[in-house]
């Protein structure tokens, strides 16, 4: 099938008609559309069409969407977009559903839906709200990716200071509440005075991660607030800061593990991202085993620990509110003990590495090669005993 871009227009009835009666009835349950138990397929399609083209409902869905999601929707209306079956793209729109995916992976926006969208978009009041929401969303994405949790007062100070938006707390809280009513606690949400990453969702099945533990680790430390251009890079959840320690880590992967340059960059980016998500060294070692790093080669392992801990200590972490461990120690020497204690726990999970690095013996009073800043005898040396 073709999309609208090549003069092939799909009506909502055509798209819905490709679903089975069972699938259509499931949609009626999700959308709270009442139909008779013995309703015919066309009757179900008509009822669903009326719901999906409701201007007020579609407006609510649009206002709950993020900036990138709006761009995604408009792209699908303008040209062919083909996605893999397992792709996470268009998840929000597919889940509602506003868009549909054909058997050959083409994303379809029904013609009636596109018409209602264009009508809503032309409304000046909607356009003004959408413009402000775009700013909120981009900054919210950046802040939850960098900090995981940020108090709403600080967030507004950052947004207003960098954009001149002059947003007030009631406006932001109201939108976050409306957004959650539509899509739950996806991406980010507001609770207890904090804007939180979705990993701390309180309304989901399974284990709940307590954000208070993160706040306790952060303590009273201030936020690292980068310039606008740098901060907004974090709106991309896969953004990786190309620091000198990152470059050194990638060079190690390329030279010592025999990987191609682009492979080394992918591995380095992956490791930095899982570090920011709280991965401990034991988790990193488990990942690195796939790429040829083994405990049997002690010299290789020793050198790896050095470059790994250097990248860890120079990566911006949520636990230090966007500061690197090195920056946090310089800014607040009182945190040195806390950070060293954490490093002590970290090194206890490392593979055993004999007291040498690069063939050179490490003496008890030498600085530990893991980067903790402690003497070897009080860090990895104690573990190796």
Identify what each model region corresponds to:
Residues 1-49, 53-55, 63-146, 150-385:
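Acidic/negatively charged segments and metal-coordination signatures
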